[in-house]
Amino acid sequence: MRCMRMLPALVIATAALGGPAAAQEHAGHHDAPAPQTGIRAELIRDVEMLEEKYVALAEAMAGKYDYRPAEGVRSAGEVFMHVAGANFLLPAMVGVSPPESMKAGSMEEMMASMRTLEQMTDEAEMRKELAHAFMHARHAIAQVPDGELDEMVQVFGSPASKRAALTMLVTHMHEHLGQSIAYARGAGVVPPWSAGSGAGGN
């Protein structure tokens, strides 16, 4: 969660980039072919696995998106939309613009976009947003050529390679998948991939 507490630094770094984002992507945004080998291919495969679990868990938790284990923490639905927002916005660190519908002309607009996502209440629309955000993340990784992976960029105010920034994008998804699994268990929902496993699984 440390990276999301530092989100304002990302906002400042990406303030020149341009509600809910299931609308249009930039023209040509998804033209980059998916790599077949190398670190980007491995990251994309990881994102695909994460997407399957997030989507399955979001479906399984239908009707329980308002569950939260304690006051003052995000609800299950807010966590899903937090992940969606990060998938749209974190790729900006490596130069991949968020969808046009994610307002990013200023810090205020960027933060408003994040808040708007986390305040969604229509569960069907939230699941669409989540799926769209994973698509954006996959295509963002594909857009960064292997030859640029060692280029240095600013990541939350500190220098890091594009490789490290893309890895952070994926580890952030893992972090909140664990959180979402704990939320599901607390709400009495067994993660679909664990159902029938006997030992309970994740």
Task: Annotate the PLM regions.
Residues 1-6:
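Positively charged n-region of N-terminal signal peptides that target proteins for export
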Residues 7-18:
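Bacterial N-terminal signal peptides
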Residues 19-23:
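Sec/Tat signal peptide C-region and signal peptidase I cleavage site
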Residues 25-38:
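N-terminal pre-domain segments of enzymes
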Residues 44-55, 64-111, 152-202:
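Short, contiguous alpha-helical
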Residues 50, 57, 86, 130-133, ...:
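Amphipathic alpha-helices that form helix-helix packing interfaces
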Residues 111-153, 161-173:
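Acidic/histidine-rich alpha-helical segments that form the ligand environment
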